[in-house]
């Protein structure tokens, strides 16, 4: 347990007391829950290690200031020294007292570290025997401005030695040893029933005297909460019980895990990480207590419209009680230096409080998912499953767990100590979960009253049925047990141990890998004998491990050791078999899924191969068609091979040839007509003598114009008629290719023959023959081009007719003016 902080005065070391070494060392100083190091001058003698603010042998202080002794340690021969090189830490361990003492100092250099180690070992070898030293309180006093006032110690000494409400281990926080609800559980149920509609519940404080009175009434027999009670008083009772737990509801290593999980940016990933941290790092009793508190808080926040307590408000009230190590400075917060001045420490403390509130808020908002989680929902209410408690329990003369001294040299300080700032120098209880300055305030163990049988919870635990310890800790075994020593246990002691937890590891997160159990072979003959035996031998531990007492001499049973080891190995074997079977089942499912995937891919590959083959065939066919069309366009109809393309393609080529011949003939006819018109116009302009001849010219010109228009329309009608008749000629084209088509003539309208169009027969026949024997190849694009050309010719014809009419009008106006000028004067 942590050494008493009561202030005492020590005399200066006498001349007869040899000084083994003197020099500077660093001690820890507490302020605002944060640890820092201060340099002090230490003097080591055979009986004590005292320290001063400055070197006492130096010059007198300014202004006549007296350099008094600030504190010290009483030495005895049972002490040992542990060195940690990486942080230059020096720890003095004493197994004497109820739970042992541990004092941590820090050297400036490694040379100083080993010099102090050698000097301490020499002094401890010459120190008085522990059994002969009077008043083994192990006082290690610190400066008054950095410690809790001595009034706390006197207040603590006046507390009852044992309470059924406060100061109980986390294992018994929610239920009594017989399975009935505890004070805390009943208070939580009351708040869930009657406190959800009370405004400011958990935030508004009640009178301290009423809270103390209600706790005393419960201890005196009033074990039920009535609906008439003040919910604010009950809420403060819950806070009071949590505040006075011997250890934090959430251990330091678990706080660190929650803090790391909360740093994740994505909300979903952060929630999953928080759940995993609770499942993997929390001991079973701590997890049950945290989930129970979250359930009550979630119920309160679900009625926030009535009580005005949101998740953030409830988290602000309860996070300092649940995440005690985080606010005590045991978790590494990046970007904040706890060794700075008061303002830096205030900022660090505020940041820690904000992080704690944010973590609890996130847990409250995700409470529904966590309850539905298989790992979190599997919380047994049996005391046999509560083996993972990280907090200390009331020491007992019958519970004996030995952590041998050689192992202490290989142990590390708790995981939460990430730097020198978090190493605690003050002596403390080895099982203490945090450096919370007031934690000693809530430890209701007797001081110096070790011979009282009423101080042991043995009588309470005797009502629990004795069970095999391996069955209770099987879920916490993660590594093989390396060294187990078990001796026979008396019925009373076995009954007591069955309801207890055992954590021999240094940190709450360390697996149970080195358990050493020894118990007394016989009951104490008397209270005095049991007390003297306990005082003579004590176990020592380092950091956060539980410090328990050594067994009586000569009480080892190798058969029990082998039996327990065999049982645990069998359990591990069964668990490994189950894991192997589970993995094999999962692998079989994955293998089946892989086979299905392979089959689907094979079928898909075959389908794609078929599609590729079909598309290649289509591509080849299109290429062949393109080649045939290109060949057809490059040769004449007579040279076109019948094997190069089908009948449809040949018909299109012939039709295109006819259309091109018609267009060429029309162009020639238009050119001839235009030339004739120009000649006639010039002739008439030069040969008109008078108005009568001019009138005759206009009449003849109009007649010729009409004849020209009729001829042009006849030509276009002939072309259209030819296009309509080409459909009928399809059946005759086979005969034309065999040579029989030369004797046939295309039927036509009697009005649309060569004579009616004014075309000589010798000119018309070659055109027709050319159209029937020299048909170039064609495509759909060529047909569209032909249609476009015909439309263009129509538009061109209209333009020419308009030009001819304009010329006629101009010619008429000029002739009229000439006629008026040549008229006789009498007109």
From Swiss-Prot:
Top-level division of the source organism's lineage: Eukaryota
Pfam families per the UniProt record, alphabetical: Lzipper-MIP1, PH, RhoGAP
Keywords assigned by UniProt, alphabetized: Coiled coil, GTPase activation
Domain PH: 18-125
SUPFAM superfamilies in the cross-refs: GTPase activation domain, GAP (SSF48350), PH domain-like (SSF50729)
General function of this protein: Acts as a GTPase activator for the Rac-type GTPase by converting it to an inactive GDP-bound state.
Bias-annotated ranges (Basic and acidic residues): 401-412
GO biological processes: cell plate formation involved in plant-type cell wall biogenesis; signal transduction
Biased composition (Acidic residues): 413-423
PROSITE patterns in alphabetical order: PH_DOMAIN, RHOGAP
Any Gene Ontology CC annotation: plasma membrane
GO molecular function: GTPase activator activity
Descriptive protein name: Rho GTPase-activating protein 6
Coiled-coil region list: 560-684
InterPro entries reported in the protein's UniProt record: MIP1_Leuzipper, PH-like_dom_sf, PH_domain, Rho_GAP_Regulators, Rho_GTPase_activation_prot, RhoGAP_dom
CDD domains (UniProt xref): PH, RhoGAP
Annotated site (Arginine finger): 203
Sequence ranges assigned to domain Rho-GAP in this UniProt record: 172-371
Region feature Disordered, mapped onto this chain: 379-437, 517-561
UniProt biased composition (Polar residues): 517-543
């Amino acid at each position: 347990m942590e050494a008493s902080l009561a202030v005492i005065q020590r005399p200066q070391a006498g001349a007869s007391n040899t000084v083994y070494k003197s020099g500077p060392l660093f001690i820890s100083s507490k302020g605002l829950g944060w640890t820092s190091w201060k340099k002090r001058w230490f003097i080591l003698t055979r009986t004590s290690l005292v320290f001063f603010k400055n070197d006492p042998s130096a010059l007198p202080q300014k202004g006549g200031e007296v350099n008094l002794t600030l504190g010290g340690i009483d030495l005895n021969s049972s002490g040992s020294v542990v060195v940690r090189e990486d942080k230059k830490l020096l720890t003095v361990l004493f197994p004497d007292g109820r739970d042992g003492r541990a004092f941590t100092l820090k050297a400036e250099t490694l040379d100083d570290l080993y010099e102090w180690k050698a000097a301490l070992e020499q002094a401890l070898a010459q120190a008085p025997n522990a059994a002969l030293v009077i008043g083994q309180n192990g006082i290690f006093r610190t400066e008054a401005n950095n410690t809790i006032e001595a009034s706390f110690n006197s207040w603590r000494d006046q507390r009852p030695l044992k309470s059924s409400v406060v100061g109980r281990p986390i294992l018994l926080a929610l239920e009594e040893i017989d399975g009935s609800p505890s004070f805390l559980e009943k208070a939580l149920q009351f708040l869930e029933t009657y406190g959800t509609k009370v405004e400011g519940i958990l935030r508004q404080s009640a009178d301290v005297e009423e809270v103390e009175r209600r706790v005393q009434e419960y201890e005196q027999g009033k074990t039920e909460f009535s609906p008439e009670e003040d919910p604010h008083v009950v809420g403060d009772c819950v806070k009071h019980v949590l505040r006075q737990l011997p250890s934090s509801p959430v251990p330091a290593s678990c706080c660190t895990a929650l803090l790391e999980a909360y740093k994740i940016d994505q909300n979903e990933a952060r929630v999953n990480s928080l759940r995993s941290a609770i499942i993997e790092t929390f001991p079973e009793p701590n997890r049950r207590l945290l989930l129970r508190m979250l359930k009550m808080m979630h119920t309160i926040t679900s009625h926030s419209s009535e009580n005005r307590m949101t998740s953030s408000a409830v988290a602000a009230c309860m996070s300092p009680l649940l995440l005690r190590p985080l606010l005590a400075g045991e978790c590494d917060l990046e970007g904040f230096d706890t060794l700075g001045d008061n303002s830096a420490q205030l900022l660090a403390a505020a940041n820690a409080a904000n992080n704690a509130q944010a973590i609890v808020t996130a847990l409250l908002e995700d409470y529904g998912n966590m309850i539905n989680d298989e790992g979190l929902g599997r919380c047994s209410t049996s005391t046999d499953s509560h083996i993972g408690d990280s907090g200390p329990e009331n020491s007992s003369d019958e519970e004996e767990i030995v952590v041998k001294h050689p192992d202490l040299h290989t142990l590390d300080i708790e995981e939460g100590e990430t730097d020198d700032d978090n190493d605690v120098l003050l002596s403390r209880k080895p099982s203490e979960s945090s450096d919370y300055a007031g934690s000693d305030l809530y430890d209701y163990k007797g001081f110096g009253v070790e011979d009282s049988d009423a101080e042991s919870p043995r009588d309470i635990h005797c009502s629990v049925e004795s069970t095999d310890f391996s069955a209770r800790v099987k879920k916490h075994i993660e590594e093989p047990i390396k060294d187990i020593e078990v001796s026979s246990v008396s019925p009373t002691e076995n009954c007591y141990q069955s309801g207890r937890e055992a954590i021999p590891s240094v940190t709450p997160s360390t697996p149970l890998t080195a358990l050493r159990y020894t118990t007394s072979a016989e009951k104490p003959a008397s209270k005095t004998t049991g007390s003297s035996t306990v005082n003579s031998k004590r176990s020592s531990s380092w950091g956060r491990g539980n410090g328990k007492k050594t067994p009586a001499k000569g009480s080892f049973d190798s058969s029990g050791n082998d039996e327990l080891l065999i049982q645990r190995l069998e359990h591990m074997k069964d668990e490994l078999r189950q894991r192997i079977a589970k993995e094999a089942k999962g692998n079989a499912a994955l293998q089946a899924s892989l086979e299905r995937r392979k089959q689907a891919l094979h079928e898909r590959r075959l389908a794609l191969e078929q599609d590729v083959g079909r598309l290649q065939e289509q591509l080849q066919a299109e290429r062949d068609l393109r080649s045939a069309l290109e060949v057809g366009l490059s040769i004449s109809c007579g040279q076109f091979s019948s094997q190069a393309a089908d009948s449809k393609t040949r018909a299109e080529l012939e039709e295109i040839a006819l259309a091109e011949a018609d267009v060429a003939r029309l162009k020639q006819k238009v050119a001839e007509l235009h030339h004739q018109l120009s000649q006639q116009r010039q002739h008439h302009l030069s040969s008109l003598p008078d108005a009568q001849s001019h009138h005759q010219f206009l009449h003849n010109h109009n007649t010729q114009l009409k004849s020209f228009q009729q001829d042009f329309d006849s030509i276009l009608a002939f072309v259209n008629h030819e296009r309509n008749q080409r459909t009928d000629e399809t059946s005759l084209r086979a005969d034309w290719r065999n040579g029989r088509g030369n004797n046939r003539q295309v039927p036509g309208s009697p009005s649309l023959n060569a004579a009616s169009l004014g075309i000589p027969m010798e000119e018309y026949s070659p055109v027709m023959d050319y159209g029937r024997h020299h048909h170039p190849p064609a495509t759909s694009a060529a047909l569209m081009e032909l249609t476009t050309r015909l439309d263009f010719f129509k538009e061109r014809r209209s333009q020419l007719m308009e030009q001819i009419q304009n010329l006629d009008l101009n010619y008429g106006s000029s002739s009229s003016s000439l006629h008026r000028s040549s008229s006789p004067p009498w007109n």
